[in-house]
Amino acid sequence: MTIPSFAIGIAGGTGAGKTTVAREITDNVGESATLIPLDNYYEDLSDRPFEERANANYDHPSAFEWELLRTHIDALLSGQSIEMPQYDFERHVRKADRVVVEPTDVIVLEGILALSDETVNDMLDLHIYVETDADVRILRRIERDVVERGRELEGVMDQYLSTVKPMHEQFIEPTKRHADIIIPEGANSVAVNLLEEKVQAETSEMTAWAARDDTAFEDATYNPQ
């Protein structure tokens, strides 16, 4: 089964407000939207010692299992369900449990490098980059990693200076050139509202298209005796 899906990619630096924008879109669309966090597709490093996993560079494109992500997005766009991996940020390993995700009208891929893979970009209908001042982003990163993910402040700061900041400059910020829309100041309410209106318009158009397609199919196959 193929369903008309509208795929959105939301990228930006750590702490830029990507998740907020993604959640506002999915909440606005409701059950017709699926959120795919890129973080869930980190390579599984469970075969390595904890210290090595803790010091790995998670902001480099090679940290992600792109082939699996491509396969999953393609499946969703083809109307097939997927088993999405889950990631343990405290232990830096992929969890054994997976979450079954069904295809929906809107698919939202969110993550620092959501716009970095050429094949994935070709699957997306709308490319968004969330841009926020670096000072604001590091404060949000600290709050998220220390409060939400249970990490030590010193480790978070060391990681930011050694990998997060240089990787942002080298790999993440350049993906802005792929963006159809750049949202300034993180979750800028005006920009997000306009974005939500666009998504709603796209989904309404897809619903109408699907209804016309179903009617055409019924007319073509109806053969009264």
Curated annotation (Swiss-Prot):
Pathway membership = Pyrimidine metabolism; CTP biosynthesis via salvage pathway; CTP from cytidine: step 1/3; Pyrimidine metabolism; UMP biosynthesis via salvage pathway; UMP from uridine: step 1/1
GO biological process: one example:
CTP salvage
Chief location of this protein?
cytoplasm
The reaction(s) this protein catalyses: uridine + ATP = UMP + ADP + H(+); cytidine + ATP = CMP + ADP + H(+)
The UniProt annotation places ATP binding at 12-19
Give the InterPro entries listed for this entry: P-loop_NTPase, PRK/URK, Uridine_kinase, Uridine_kinase-like
Instruction: Quote the cellular component terms of the Gene Ontology held in the record.
Output: cytoplasm
Q: Recorded E.C. number(s)?
A: 2.7.1.48
Q: Which GO terms describe its molecular function?
A: ATP binding; cytidine kinase activity; uridine kinase activity
Q: Which CDD domains match?
A: UMPK
The record, for SUPFAM superfamilies, names: P-loop containing nucleoside triphosphate hydrolases
In terms of Pfam families, this protein maps to: PRK
Q: What class of enzyme is it?
A: transferase
Where is it localised? Answer: Cytoplasm
Keywords (alphabetical) are:
ATP-binding, Cytoplasm, Kinase, Nucleotide-binding, Transferase
The source's domain of life comes to: Archaea
Q: PANTHER family attached here?
A: URIDINE KINASE
Q: Which family does it belong to?
A: Belongs to the uridine kinase family.
Instruction: Report the protein name in the record.
Output: Uridine kinase
Q: What is the lineage of its organism?
A: Archaea, Methanobacteriati, Methanobacteriota, Stenosarchaea group, Halobacteria
Quick one: which gene encodes this?
udk
